Amino acid sequence: MEVEKELKTFSEVWISAIAAACYCRFVPAVAPHGGALRLLLLLPVVLLFIFLPLRLSSFHLGGPTALYLVWLANFKLLLFAFHLGPLSNPSLSLLHFISTTLLPIKFRDDPSNDHEKNKRTLSFEWRKVVLFVAKLVFFAGILKIYEFRKDLPHFVISVLYCFHFYLGTEITLAASAVIARATLGLDLYPQFNEPYLATSLQDFWGRRWNLMVSDILGLTTYQPVRRVLSRWVRLRWEVAGAMLVAFTVSGLMHEVFFFYLTRARPSWEVTGFFVLHGVCTAVEMVVKKAVSGKVRLRREVSGALTVGFVMVTGGWLFLPQLVRHGVDLKTIDEYPVMFNYTQKKLMGLLGW
């Protein structure tokens, strides 16, 4: 990877994305009501966001860019086309609009949330900081262990990859949130909620894992499908059907995301992963309702079963496509390149 060239391309991609988001902010002046005209005006930006990440070849720049633009930003723009979603608030400032469009963030703008924010204690904030630092140390430890990967059993490497994927995703999204918070000075909803503490699949996917993706899937898929199904089926099947569709859409979008990482035809394994979890989550909900008050697993047991199921199925269906195309090795190899480049630049700035 040519670092200077990749960083230059990265800058060009994001300058283009910011310019496109500025254009989107003023589309309502031409099409004040959501509908076909606004959708037509936004489609060029949707297409631009699809093609921009193809210019990047590195995992650590191309991956987040594809997630932010191709999936999250485009889904927000499609909602915006019909005057729905987080971008439809006419009081958003230009900077607020751009940040909401391009970054995986959601601002706390409810007065009750402001009151809640004021009630937070300093010790609680410090606990969050200490926990995040611990995650950074753990992440660095995983990278160090990779130096001995040739001597490690396959299942150990799969476990490391699962932790790597989680920690890398949370750290990357947290960096985006820090930029938005520093720029706008506003409080944000959390992007992850300690998914390793989940006690059920519903808890894991609905309340703990990648909450920005869950939120946008709820607005674009789950809620509309549930409204349609509510006319034809009972509540239990309405919820289960909408959930399964949302998981399927998530799987398809992960296939798209994986294409940007591998530049290879989809294998549909990752779609299978999310369809499987959609079915299992729906079954879990039905079973929990059927045995409510009769059977209750200890939190430690249900937590271990939940996280274990996610990791085992992840190693079976989620990771193989990335490993098959060498994305894992490419990702690992980029860390020393980034470290050496950053070290060189810092030493240059300090005159050493």
Curated annotation (Swiss-Prot):
Record's catalysed reaction(s): a long chain fatty alcohol + a fatty acyl-CoA = a wax ester + CoA
Transmembrane segments: 13-33, 34-54, 67-87, 128-148, 155-175, 239-259, 267-287, 303-323
UniProt GO molecular function: long-chain-alcohol O-fatty-acyltransferase activity
The enzyme's E.C. designation: 2.3.1.75
Topology of this chain in the membrane: Multi-pass membrane protein
One GO BP annotation of this record: lipid metabolic process
Pfam families the record matches: MBOAT_2 (PF13813)
Places the protein is found: Microsome membrane
Keywords recorded for this protein, A-Z: Acyltransferase, Endoplasmic reticulum, Lipid biosynthesis, Lipid metabolism, Membrane, Microsome, Transferase, Transmembrane, Transmembrane helix
Main location: membrane
Annotated GO CC locations: endoplasmic reticulum; membrane
InterPro entries found in the cross-reference section: Wax_synthase, Wax_synthase_dom, Wax_synthase_Magnoliopsida
Family: Belongs to the wax synthase family.
Entry function: Catalyzes the final step in the synthesis of long-chain linear esters (waxes). Has activity with both saturated and monounsaturated acyl-CoA ranging from 14 to 24 carbons in length, but C20:1 acyl-CoA is the preferred substrate.
UniProt name for this protein: Long-chain-alcohol O-fatty-acyltransferase
